[in-house]
Amino acid sequence: MVGTTDEQTPSYADAHQPYARAPTIFETEFSSWTRERLVKGITDVLVDALGVDEDELTEGARLEADLGAESIDYLDILFRVEKEFGIEIPRGELFSINGVVFEDDAFRRVGGPSQNKIYVTEAGLAELKERLPHLNVDAFAADPDLALASDLHTVGSMVRFLEFRQQKIREMSGAESA
């Protein structure tokens, strides 16, 4: 960050602590939305951001491989999700696989026939599960080639992310879990 010192820059752990404030009125409303409403919102976001047809948006549709998302699209999708659902998404919570894996040497290893592939280690997989619980890391663990990691970002993982966010907001407000 420009103009900050290391002491001023929050760590990942600091930035991702449970909420220490009351939820906003928008967050409270969002926390009560049904799964169907979440799916509809994600559908609207992806149709607008990627120019795809609604019938392409199955739960398992991969953002890059199936829907044609490119790196710049992820930022657009993030902003549209925030606007659609009235929530703020801290940097790295929705799309941050590479950020997690490259943060620590213990989370990756080099391999392959020419030693030219990067694989996520067991420690890296565990870290991904903890930080990005909305992703299906177990399926990725069978072949943890980092080049395949973008396949973890699916329509379903985006809906699960919103469900996890709803749960955090309910916990923050003291409401009982659904």
State where each predicted segment sits.
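Phosphopantetheine-dependent thiolation modules in NRPS/PKS and related acyl-activating systems
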Residues: 2-79, 83-178
